[in-house]
Structures are given as structure tokens and as C-alpha cells.
Amino acid sequence: MKLKLHHINLCSTNVEAMDRFYRDVLTLGDEKPSELPPLNQGKGLVGDVSFVTDGAIQMHLTPKDVLNSFKSGQVVNPLERGHIAYRTDDIEAFMKHLDEQGIPYSDWGSDAVKGWHQVFFYDPDGNVIEVHQIVNT
């Protein structure tokens, strides 16, 4: 079970302004279309998302949604304050590892992002962490 940093998600009430800031000030560019996840609008994500990159790590700029947990039925809300995300090659083994560590998590499956099995959980300070695996759907 390998883990690799995949993206940083920042939530905003103004995605367009955030996009301009990261492109103009930090000179980040577009993510390659082949690297972009297919989003399931209305199932976790609502609104436009911007994807920028430094060429190595993606940054997902998403609309802030403080009511996401109520809408999705999930305990962990990755769209309230954002999150950091890791990609794994074995999501089942990772969930078993979380169970063994006694860490509760929300299993989103592929509801929000088609082809990604996502789980979200909190670190000791309440920061949201995502771990996902690319899966066939």
C-alpha cells in the first residue's frame, strides 16, 4: 500500500478570484486534461472547480460548501475548509489500516469523483485528509 501526495484542495467563496491569484501571483498553470478527474456534479461538488498545477502537484480550487455533510450524508466535509489528498494503490488495505489505527473515516466511494474511490478523515488537529485510488467504474 503506497501513498503519494496528489493534490491540495482549497475551498473558496470566489473560485474565480482564487484561480486568478494562483495563476498570476504564483504563475501556476493548467493541469493536463488527461490528469483531471471527472466530477459528479451535485454529489459532493456543486459549482465550478479550477485545476491548477506547478507541474508536479495539483491544486483543486473548489466552492466552499459548509452544508456538504448534510447533503451528502457523510460525516467528514472536505469542502468546508479544504483538504490534502494522497493517492494509494490499495484503498481497501488503507481502510483496513485506518480501522486498525482506530481512526474513523467517511467512505465516499466514487460518489463525488467518477473513477476515484475516496475516503476522508481527520488528523489530530481536525485537518481533513483524503486518500483515493483510481478504480474502474
Where are these predicted regions, by residue range?
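Vicinal oxygen chelate
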Residues: M95-T137
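A short, acidic/glycine-rich surface segment
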Residues: E35-N40, L67-S72, D107
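Short acidic/polar mixed-charge low-complexity motifs
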Residues: G55-Q58, D125-N127
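Short loop/turn microsegments at loop-to-beta-strand junctions
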Residues: H6, G47, W116-H117
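Short amphipathic alpha-helices within nucleic acid-binding modules
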Residues: F21, E92-H97
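N-terminal beta-strand motif that seeds the catalytic metal site of vicinal oxygen chelate
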Residues: M1-D19, K32, R81-Y86, N136-T137
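Core segments of cupin and vicinal oxygen chelate
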Residues: N9-I57
